[in-house]
């Protein structure tokens, strides 16, 4: 039985990795072994940062809500507690959007929260 050569498979694998490494600087986009290391590391970063993105956005929303709440004379924690007691079920993403784009409606929510405290 003849020896099975892996040239086609290897070339496909190399091309796939080098295609993923496009845009990297220097040897990281030219040499297979170095490109492969960088692509693997990049995929690890991508996985990690997809998880971190959720935390980052939640922090951003809380910061925006807190700033808008303090402009209306109440702290973030008291606002959230007041909204919970009032039965207002609105998430932080929507609250932050409202704080930035519709200050009047956010002010009404603050009044509702203050009334329930």
Curated annotation (Swiss-Prot):
GO biological process: what's one of them? ribosomal large subunit assembly
Any one GO CC term of the record = ribosome
What are the entry keywords? Ribonucleoprotein, Ribosomal protein, RNA-binding, rRNA-binding
**Which domain of life, per UniProt?**
Bacteria
Read off the Gene3D superfamilies from this record.
6.10.160.10, Ribosomal protein L20
CDD domains the UniProt entry points to:
Ribosomal_L20
**Molecular function in Gene Ontology:** rRNA binding; structural constituent of ribosome
Cystine links in this protein are none
Calcium as a keyword of this entry, yes or no, is: no
Query: What NCBIfam families does this protein's entry cite?
Result: rplT_bact
Check the record and name the HAMAP family matching this protein. Ribosomal_bL20
Family membership? Belongs to the bacterial ribosomal protein bL20 family.
Q: What does this protein do?
A: Binds directly to 23S ribosomal RNA and is necessary for the in vitro assembly process of the 50S ribosomal subunit. It is not involved in the protein synthesizing functions of that subunit.
* This protein's name: Large ribosomal subunit protein bL20
Q: Can you name the source organism?
A: Pelotomaculum thermopropionicum (strain DSM 13744 / JCM 10971 / SI)
Which gene is annotated as encoding this protein in its UniProt record? rplT
